[in-house]
Regions:
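N-terminal auxiliary segments of SAM/dcSAM-dependent transferases
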Residues: 1-105
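Conserved SAM-binding loop of SAM-dependent methyltransferases across substrates and taxa
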Residues: 152-164
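Conserved class I S-adenosyl-L-methionine
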Residues: 141-151
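A short glycine-rich, Lys/Arg-flanked "PGG" loop and its adjoining helix->strand segment in the class I
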Residues: 231-245
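S-adenosyl-L-methionine
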Residues: 172-210
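Conserved SAM-binding motif I beta-strand of class I
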Residues: 166-171
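Conserved beta-strand signature within the Rossmann-like core of class I S-adenosyl-L-methionine
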Residues: 246-253
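Class I S-adenosyl-L-methionine
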Residues: 257-294
């Protein structure tokens, strides 16, 4: 299998609200009020310089990212892509579907929207807290982990934060990875302990050996006709094969159709049992099932 390279950090996506804050600090600086010299965004720490009424973020490797009024003028739901020369566009893409990085209030990690639909839980939580909740259910120090749906990489990063020694993560959509490469909160995807595979998880899992992983996090998009291949008995049997005995699986299901009496978690639980898992139950904090290979 071929690993995906996130590339070096040449451009970053900055929430418009943070751009405004940075320019405000520079105005204070011009009045002789020295602002803090360090700025943290996600997994990145920058030095702050103020040059010609622009904020210049300097990474630890020396790369420079120029934030100007154009970046600050975007709406609150937009992130500006900036590089060494300044504003380069909005953190969005269109290729059959519309993709956009959307910042959240309070400096929380941004979410990804595809055709206006959040790819993360944001009601009553935030993407990072949700990723930690999922990882904490199955990941322990030293574990080898498979994360089947990379997205912006928060779950893989959370697994490393929990002490995983190695994480393989699979993403089917290269545009999603391109946006993750811009996102400062996704920067730790470049950690040498995380290995990214561009491909269909249904096919990629067949390439792993028996008992290859200690834990598996399956966080698919909501169930639909186009994502149904991520909810099949065939795939769950592959999960059972590649997990070691005693290894745990977290499977996000959400609660779609609960009001209408539909029960996706129950259906998934039945298929997991048929695949050989013991289902330990539904974990409301993470809105998914935990199962173990006995």
């Amino acid at each position: 299998m071929e690993l995906y390279n996130m590339g070096s950090l040449r451009r970053i996506a900055v929430p418009s609200s943070i751009a405004k804050e940075l320019l405000g600090r520079c105005r204070e600086w011009s009045r002789g009020e020295r602002p803090p010299a360090k700025v943290r965004m996600g997994g990145l720490v920058f030095g702050l310089q103020c040059i010609d009424e622009r904020a210049v973020l300097v990474s630890e490797s020396g790369s420079r990212f120029v934030v100007d009024e154009h970046a600050a003028s975007l709406g609150e739901r937009s992130m500006a892509v900036v590089g060494s020369t300044g504003f380069m566009g909005v953190a969005e893409a269109y290729r059959g579907s519309y993709y956009k990085l959307v910042p959240l209030p309070g400096g929380k990690p941004p979410t990804l929207e595809i055709n206006g639909i959040h790819m993360h839980r944001v009601a009553g939580t935030d993407p990072w807290s949700d990723a930690l909740a999922k990882a904490s259910l199955v990941v322990k120090r030293g574990f080898r982990v498979l994360d089947t749906c990379t997205g912006l990489g928060y779950t893989s990063i959370a697994a490393i934060a929990r002490g995983a020694s190695l994480v393989y993560t699979v993403e089917v959509d290269e545009i999603v990875l391109q946006l993750a490469a811009l996102n400062p909160w996704s920067h730790r995807l470049r950690d040498k302990r995380i290995r990214i595979i561009l491909g269909d998880a249904v096919e990629v899992v067949r390439d792993f050996g028996d008992s290859a992983f200690d834990a598996l996090i399956h966080d698919p998009p909501r169930f639909s006709k186009s994502t149904s291949s991520l909810y099949t008995l065939e795939l769950y049997r592959e999960f059972h094969r590649i997990l070691r005995r005693g290894g745990r699986l977290f499977h996000y299901t959400g609660e779609p159709g609960r009001i209408r009496g539909l029960n996706l978690p129950g259906r998934v639980a039945r298929l997991l049992r048929e695949a050989g898992f013991e289902v330990l139950g539904f974990r409301r904090r993470a809105l998914g099932l935990v199962a173990v290979k006995m």
